[in-house]
Amino acid sequence: TQGVSSAASDVYKRQLQDFTAAVERLVAGIERKGSVLRSDERQVVAYHEMGHALAASSLPAMDPVHKVSIIPRAAGSLGYTLQRPTDDRYLISTQMLRDRLVVLMAGRAAEHLAFGQVSTGAADDLGRATDIARQLVTRFGMSPVLGQAVLERQQAGYLGDSLLRLSLIHI
């Protein structure tokens, strides 16, 4: 019976490892086995990812950090920080969106603090943060300056263009 229990436990562990690997492939892409980063690049990527992980861990509204990797992936990322939701979420508050912005920008901030400069490795994070910031203002009406206005749906024209330009300046 102890052997059966041990075998069942091994099967469960293997299934969990396979599931985790599948999630990582979906989120970050397939590992680039032949890609080896230079030591200095690996250090920058490590600081960058730890910036994300530390920020996510320090913000109570953020999902917990499950794994941090600095293994290059086929999708173009040199590393990633994987957060796992603890429950289903259907609504996202202003604070949660702002916290996501903090986590996205924390990798770049960590690079700047550690090395006095930033790298191109933060380009995807910067793009995603810009998208969230734009949606906060133009889609969700969460701007303290422009108020509760959904600018994304307005028809083109003089007023719509002016408000959109104003919202982009605000972002």
Q: Can you say where each PLM-predicted feature lies in the sequence?
A:
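Alpha-helix N-cap/helix-initiation motif
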Residues: 1, 36-39, 90, 122
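Adenylate-forming
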Residues: 23, 170-171
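C-terminal helical "lid" subdomain and adjoining coupling/linker elements of P-loop NTPases
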Residues: 10-19, 25-44, 140-148
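Single conserved hydrophobic/aromatic residue that forms the stacking wall/gate
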Residues: 1-8, 12, 169-170
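Soluble catalytic regions of large protease machineries
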Residues: 43-47, 53-168
